[in-house]
Every structure is written in structure tokens, then in C-alpha cells.
């Protein structure tokens, strides 16, 4: 009320002048029409803007006035002149509400509440500035004309007065939120406007007739309006107040009116110029604007209005119209933005307004069914997110998602609601009306009443004044209390309920700092001010130190000192100021105030040091503080520092010592208890350990990382409590991060390490630079994969590759261009070698002379020195000695490395055509005999390839003869060399004489001649002895040097020189310059036999004179008697077909026929049946599955015989390769195992079902054959019975027969042999899953246990071989899930192929030699029947050829005698022929066990056991 009464008189004058301005009437109709026509060119475009501006003026009357503002009723009308008429009057009542921002609305509140100045303002067309008009500018004539015009307008368009109309919810909503779309009701004639003033204290509703502003051509863009800055109207000069004129003045003459108009035009032009100048000043001096002036709303400038104003200035008749159009422009009203696409969007529009808009447009969707929510639909709104759903949809949603606790989550905000679905009750938005019905005059789903809810999450006490609405209530529009900024210089005001976060103004804080001397120079800020940063010089209390960097106001001043010397801080040192006694100094720390008086003054000391005896009792008088204090004889008894014990010493001077009383104390970890001195305990407690003592127990509790132990002695922490943090691991983790470059720098922790935080801000490109990873690039990122071809040029220069490889990191793949290169050993040029191949080997033997000068390198063509690579050899463990490439001993190898002598680079290719030697070739030291030795070695090596024993004997004899001849030659050469040396010595005698007497004079020339004639030096004996002694020492040094050099020149291979003690060679490492050791016995294995050669034992070699021989047992004697019996009855006529017969050409022991072969010729005769030596190098029985081969041979006898015939014909032929085609894996298994049995090489071609066979150097036809072995062993599995009258016993590989001459027994023997020919039936389980094991098949055939054997051919095929047909027939009818069939022995499943075709089977030639079998004889039916065991036995029985063994044994004994004689002459032992495979059970197991043993390790010597 007080503010409303204190309205300044200027405001009242302005209100009266407003009415007078609006009553101006122009009499010049022609001028009015012309001006209006020019000004209405954009009439249609600006119609909406003018209407909105008019409505904005109307809306300004709905201002909230906190203080009662009394507005007078004004009735103003405006005239508009269309282009086609002269003068027309319109009265529009549209209430289109403009869209203004909250700041403008807030400014309107501020202007109405505090300014209370309703001034009549007029907008200038030039500058869009607000111009204030006073009554002095209006003449009396203009007032009279305006009065007439006002009366005419009142008669034509006087608005009817109607009662006050209440606001609906749309108008109320717009009133609270001007951003929303305005509600425009349809006009019905002339409708008055309701100007409602909502006052917080008193609401005064007055009816006002709001004037209409004329249509103004304002085509200014919307964006420019927003960017225009408001300008202060402070340059407007106040006009002198004129007396109030009546509302209807009297008309005056026309001449006076025109002069008044001209004066008005001049005044307006002057004011406009002042306005433009003030506008520029305001723009340039924005920083000097006062805060109070910045609160006023200033109109924006319009450039289009400026241009139009310039045209109107030239026309004086348009002044009145422009003044009338701008008369109702209220000062301080900013322009609103009416285009919804500019700033009116969902980000700035409240949720409630968005929901109202969607509901009215019927486009609001349910989040459950995605259908539009109809106006008649039953809805449910979430109380948290205010989302609307169909009631049926939300019930279905909640019923499906409800938990056991009865909670379910909202689909929009996931809030847990506890209301059960069946308790849903539809209600309006405010909750007042249950299940509201649709009313077209109200918002759908609302009750149409005022909301009245308090705003959530706000302290506002006012309730919502909007009508029932969806979404959250809008913020309260009431203003709150006035508050100050942080520094208190600026005041601000917030809306009601708005959170106050404080305000920072642009001024300085200027609060007094803590020092009390300076003020804060920072900008207005929150919190306390920072300490004063000004430093000053201060002195300590004792005066020793002066600090010039002390902060201002720090410290405490010492008031005891004088003002001229202020002191502020303590230096923490001893005071040392002189006390009042003048003798002592203060011992306290630098302190504030005066020092205490001296404590040794006689007045203050009246007792001894222990305070138990007075000085009078002691009879001592002290006169000065320097006099000593006397000591009594009592115990001190002063309480010590431990506060528990007293001093036990006598009264003494000075402080008491530490307490020496022992007390029971516990260590820091609490595990040890000891008695220690109390004083020591006190010192330990005051130290960093904070314990009485520490024990030596080491804590083994894991630290926080769970990897390291604590390791602290006497740790006070436990596994459960660690208040001191002793178990926090302080080690650095140090693990490699994922990037692979950096390590984890965190403290040791459990779990995974973090990712590497280092990034690269450079582009990571591929090597060619065409693929790039943009930064930042995490550490450890690999270069990108590039699909472009590699651009790196090779060093070799080749670029025409078969395929171009992609861009890559790292080196390029090896070059595949084919070039010609010299082999690594320098033997020949290799063609079509890859360019990237460094060492191309030609495959030949190296043949370079080694460093020992006795061997050549046996390695395949290689690069680098010819040394043995012993990197992978364990020197500590004795390695088995091999015939080639053996490892040198450790000492020799170290000597070789220390010497570092270069190896000889001579490329002496002395290798012969037999390059498959088993040891490096020996080179004799005598150069003259090298060629002879090479020839002898060639012959010897070629002769060794023959299989006849006679040839071996001859070759050995030749070798012995050659060696003897070489020795003789060496001896002769040595003798000749010795003679030559003696001759040289005799010749040297004359030279000595010449040199010794070279210095003699001419007088003694005759004596010199005489001395020259003598052959000896007779005068210089002493000098000669000295020279000889020196030469002898030099020779010894040279010999030692030579021995050391020769010791370092060892090649590391076997020596290989034949030993003198036996027929074996030296197996020591190469030892150049040293003879083979004779004190070491030969370690080679030999086999000794009994007299009849039936028994044999393997033992160590004992030299050439080995006379050890086994004794024959009873079996030998029995067989000897049988031989003699056969010889007595039948003689030797059956020895022609015996393979052991000396007269038989197939006899390997035949000494009468010898066949010598060279390296350039091949044997055309078939290879004889030989017996493999188990001690040979090529013998590898561990790779042969002999038991499985014998087992499958019982099921496939026909197939075995066909394979044997194929292999034997291949061995007897000149072919180097044989190709066989097979059908399934069983044939492949048989072919591979038989190839191992015959010791042949093979190569599989599984995709083509081919297998190729090649001959080895050790290929032989085994004896007995596999079919014979199966026939002999087959008696154990057959169901038939064999007569005991004819039995074959196999002992150590040789068969002997004990028979009777009964014909019936012979027939039984033949029948038994025929029964052995029958194959064992078998079942083939095929296509088995890899998970099927032997146990599965064993469980299937468990009822036939002991009557079958299983043999896995491969991972998916298995054979079950049965011993009788009954069990087989029962097993073949068993039902199982496995796939099986009866195995068929079909020889036609394998065929021989030559090239890509399979040969047909030719018949054997009738004229073929009986000694040589036909290559394809195994395919002849006649030959096949003859090859059977039954046929051979029957033929022998018919001819009584079974007695030929007697003659055979007899001839063998004769041959052995001859061999023994030859051995005695040549000192060479011939190995007897021993069969490889034995068919008896005991011997077979022994042979299998022996085959699995390593031949290089301990060998059992059975000689001592026998």
C-alpha cells in the first residue's frame, strides 16, 4: 500500500498525456491515405506480428503485483487506413498470446513490482527506441483535433461493456507458462479483455479497454531480434512537467495547428539524433552500466524501421500516423519469439506441456502396446516418471513381472511399485476424481479443476494453480526473499522453491584476511578467503634467527620485548639467554616471554641433591649459585622415568640413570616372554618399534596381494587384524602388461593388472603407409592389416614372384625364384634351387680331409667346417659308439676349441663308388702309398659287398697281405730316411770348419786348407757339444709342440684302424700321432658256439686266439647220433637239393665257387637265402611287429604267400622299385610289415592306394619265411591233434627232426601238416569310432575268452582271430551295435603295377632254370600248389629226403673244420649262420626281449653262467 501511494507525479502526468496523444486526429485525409498506402506494403506479412504485439500488450495486464498497483481505466482506440479507403476504424478483440521466454516474464514482474511506472512509451521507427513524450510537446490545436476524432471514434466503434469473464485452464496455463502455444478463442463481435492482476496480498481486478496499435510494417527477421542487445534509455533528458490538460481540449485554428506540427517534427528529429548518439555510447560503454540500470528492459532496434523512418522524415504528413502507431508501445517490453521452430522444442518445454500437446493431438503412445492412448481410454500414470499407460496393458505387464515380494517395475523408469495389479483404480491426473469421464471442454483424462498439489522435491509452500494436468507441476512463479552474493555487494532474488546455490558477482571480495592487515583481492567467491600471501621479516624469541619469508600475520608476538624489536616465532633451539644470576644461561627451548630465574641460587637451594638432608645438617653454606650442591650418604630414592621404581644409587649430582630393575616383558608379536631391564624397555617403547623388545620369529602371513609373505620379524599384526597396515604389500607388481612393452607400476595386488594407460598420438601406419590407425593409439597395438601388396624390394633383386604377398611387418618371406647355385661342399652346381636357400646340398659325401689328416668327412654335402655338432650331446653320459659321425670325447673337443686351428681346405675327393661306408676313410701318412691304399680300399670295399664266405676269406687275406706289404714298405722307407740323415750329418762337418775359421788371417791360409781336408772338427769339441745340446733341446721342444698340435688336430670320429689283437677296428676317438691303445681290451660282442653249432652264447671279444667253445649237451649228442644213423642208412644222395650242401650252388658256405663283383657291375644271379645277423647295424627288429604279423598271417595264409612271392621275385630281379596297389588297410598293414620283415624301404601313397618298395643295402630273404614260421607255430592254435611220432623242435633257430620209420606215422604227419595249411577264421570289425577301445570288444566277446585274439590294424579296424571254427561260428551270429563281417583271405586284393597300369599275370616259362625262380611264378596255379608246405613234406617223405639233414650236418662239420683251418692261417673268424627268428616259445620271448634292448648298453655275458 505504501508503494502504491508513493507514485511520483511524473507517472500521473504521463498517464494523462497518454490519453491526449491517442486523441490526435489528422484532418488531412489525402495525406493519411497516401501514408497508409505506402506503409501497408507488407500488411499481410506483418499482420500476425502486429496482432501478437497487440496481444502482448494485453497480456502485460496480467501481471502479478506484490504491492497494490492501481491501474486507471483507459479507453483508447486506434485508426487504421487500408489502401483502398480513406479512413476506417477497427476494433479487434483477438487474444493471441505471444510466446515469450521466462526472462521477459520475470522482467515484467520486476517492472511492475518495483518501478510502478506505467509510462506511455512510443517506439521510434528509426531506431526502435522507446521515446518519452510530455504534455509540453502537444499543442492545443492538436488536442482539440484529437478530441474531435475521439468523439467520432466513440460513436463508430465504442466497445460494449460486459461483466468480467473467468479464465479457463488454457488461459491459466499460458499465464503460468508463456512458452506454450497460446489459446485463441474465436472472436464474437467486440469482446472486452479481462485484465486480471494477481497480487499475493490483495487482488484488484479492473476492467481495462486495451488499445490497439496500428499495423506496422515490421519485416525484421526473427534471428536479428534475438541478437539485438537492449540499450539503456538513460540518455533521455527529462522534460519539464506540464500542467495536466483536459481530456477533451477545444479546437484551435488550422494555422496554429500546422506551426505546432512543424515544431513537433523538428523536436522529434533532434531527439532521434540524440537517441542514436546515446545508443552508440551505450554500446561502447557496456562495462560502465550500473546493475540497477541493467535490470530495465530496453527495446530492440529494427533496421527495417530505420530505413522506413528515413523515407517518412521527408514526408511531413506521416508524422502524426507514426506517432499514433507508436503511442501504445510500452517502455521496457522485449520482443517475443513466435516461431515454434526457433527455440520452442522438447528440450526447453516442460514435460507437462509436452504431454498436454500430445494428448490434445491424440498422438500419445502407450509404452507397452505402442498404440495411441485414446481420449476415452482408461489410463494409469506412474507416480515417478508420469508416463501414461493403458490400464489393461499395465495390469498385464505388472502381473507378468511381479516378484515374490509383490513388487514390479515400471516400464518407463524401472521404479519398483508395490501396488498390486488388482488394486489399480483409474483416476484423473491430480487424483481428485476417480475414473473421470471424457469432457470435450476439458483435457482428456483430467477433472477440469485446479490441480492444487504441492510441488515435489521443492520447498515451495504454494500449491499448483494449473488445471488438472499430466506430468510434474510447473515451477512456482512467485518470488522468494532477497539474498546477497558471497561478498555481500550484490543482491539477487530467486523464484519460490528454487534451490539457492549462491551467486558470484563480478566485483572483488575485499574481505579482511586473517592477518588483519590486508584485504582479499580475488573475485567474489564462496568459502573462506585464502591466507594472506604477503611475506614479512620476523625474528625468533631468542633473537638468534631472522626469517624474511614468514607469511603476514603468522606467529604470536612476544609482548615482553620492546616495541622496537618485535619477536614472533620459536626457532626450536636452546634459548641460551643469560639468566638473572648472570652466571648461567637458559636451557629451555626458544620460548616466549622472560626466562625463569636461576634454580641454583643459594636462596632457592636448601637441601642436598636427593632432597633428604638439609644443608644445615651437612654444615655447608652456599654463597653463590656457582657453589656445588653437597651430597649426603643416603640412597637417592628418586622416582625414575618409568614411574614405577626409584633410584637405588647414593645421593649423586646430576640426573638419575636408567632403571635397571628386570621385569617380565612380552615381545611385539606376543609369542616370546623374557626378563629385561625396565629402563631398556622404556627406551624401546619410546622408539619406532613401540614394543618392549622384538623376537626373531619371522611372520609368514600372506600380505594383501596374497602372493608374498610378510617376512617381518616379530610382526605385531595378525592374519585377521592389521591396523598398522603391516600386511599391505609395498612391492611393485612388475608384471608385464597386455601391451607387452611396459610393466605394472602399481603396488603388488591380486587379480589382473590394469590396461596400459600410455597412448601414442602419432598415426600408426602399415609398412607401405596406405593403411593408418588414427590416434590415440593404445600401447601395444599391432600395425594394421593391410591388403595392399608389399612394396619392399628384395636384396636379391628378384621381383617376378609367382604371387604377390600382402603388406606385412617384419622380413619378407623367402624368395622362391629358381636359380643355379654351387653346392655347399663345392662339388657341383645345383640347378633350380630357390634363391633363399643358403646351403644347397648335392647329396654326395663331403669327402674333405679332416684336421687329423687321417680321415675324410663322412657327412653329406654341408657348409661350414667339417666338425661334429655336439650341442645336443650329454658329455657326462657315455654315448653309444656309432660307425660314423661319432661324438668326440669332452677333453679332445675342448682342446679342439682351444686350438682354433683352421681345417684343411683341400677338396681331395678320394671317395670311391661305394660311398655307403660305415666309417670315415683312413688316409695313410706316407704320401707315396696313398694311391695304392685307395685302390686296395676300393677292392676291399667292393669285395665286402659279396655274400659268399669264400670271397670274404679271400678279401681278408688280401687285406692282410696288403697291410704286410705296406708295413714292409714303411720299414724300408724308414731305413732309407735314416741313412740319408746320417749322410747329411757327415756333410755338415765341413761346413762347421768353414764357418768357424772364417775370421782367420791370410797368414794361416795354409792351415785352413789342411783343416778343410779333414772331415771332422778336432779343435772345437766343447763348442760342438754345446751346439749339439742346444739342438737336442730344440728337438725335444719341437716334439712336444708337435704332440700338442697333433692332439688338438683330432677330428672327433672313430679311429677305425684294425687292431692287432683281434679282427675288430679301434673304437677310440681319433688320436693322430698316437698308436692305438694296446692295454684296453676289445669291447665288441662275439658269439661262440658248441662243436655242432647248435648252442650259442653272446660274449665280449677276447682276441684272435680265442679258444673258448661251448660243450654240447644231451640234445646235441642225440642229434649227432641221428645224423650218423641217417648217414649209415642212406648216404649223401639227398644233398643236391639241400641248401647247406657244399655242392649246391645256393649254399652260402660254398668255398669252391666265388663271385667277385665290382662297383660297375651287378649280380645277375638270384640272391641266395641268407640269415640275418642280429648284431648287424641294419638289424632293427624293434620296428617290426613280428607277433602281429604272425597272428594276421594265420588268418591270411594265401595273401602272405602271394606277398612273399612278390617280394622274392622283386629281390631276385634287377628292378630298383616295385609298386603294389592294395584295397584296404589290412593289405597295407601286411605290405608294410612284410617290407620291414624283408628289410626293404617303402613309401606310401594313401590317396592312390599305392605303395612303393625300394631295395636297401641289407635287403635279404629271411629264413625261415613267415609262411613257414606260421605253419610251424600254427599247431598250437589248431583244433586238430598232431601225432608225436613226427614233431618239429626249434631250438635257437635250427630245426631238427626225430622220426621213426613207421609209414602210418608219416601219413599222420602229412595230415597234420595239411591241417596247418587251413587258415584261422576271423571277424573284421570295421569303421569303428575312435572312442571304441579294446575293452568294448573284449566285453562283447567275453563268452569266447581264451579262444580268440584281437589285433588292431588301425584306429578304426580290428581283427578277432579265432582258434576253432565252433567258437567262430557262434561269434559270427552275435548281435551288436558294431559293424563287422567275416574276414576273407583274398589274394586278388593286391596287384603289381608298372607306371599307371596293372600288369596281367603271365604264366611261368617251362624252360626256366630250376635254380632261378620266375618273377611272376607266384601267380601260377601249379607253382602255387608246389610251394605249399604239405607238398614239400610229401615229396621229402616219398624220396626219404628228410634224412638229408644227416649229410647236411656232416658237410657242415667238414666246412667248419676247413674254416677253422683257414682262420688259423688268416687269423680271421667267420660268423656262423644263425637264424633270425625262433619259433619256440622260450626262445621267441627271448628274441623279442633282446630286440627291445639297446645294443649299445650292457650285454649279458652267458659264458660264465654256462
Curated annotation (Swiss-Prot):
It comes from the Eukaryota. The keyword Thylakoid does not apply. Residues 217-232, 267-282, 981-1002, 1021-1031 have a biased composition (Basic and acidic residues). It holds the Pfam family zf-NF-X1. SUPFAM superfamilies: RING/U-box (SSF57850). GO terms for molecular function: DNA-binding transcription factor activity, RNA polymerase II-specific; RNA polymerase II transcription regulatory region sequence-specific DNA binding; zinc ion binding. A zinc finger (RING-type) spans 366-414. GO terms for cellular component: nucleus. Residues 1-123, 142-164, 181-282, 897-1012, 1021-1040, 1132-1167, 1447-1473 are annotated as: Disordered. GO terms for biological process: negative regulation of transcription by RNA polymerase II. Residues 13-103, 110-121, 194-209, 253-263, 903-921, 935-980, 1137-1167, 1447-1470 have a biased composition (Low complexity). Disulfide bonds: none annotated. This is Transcriptional repressor NF-X1 homolog. The gene is nfx1.
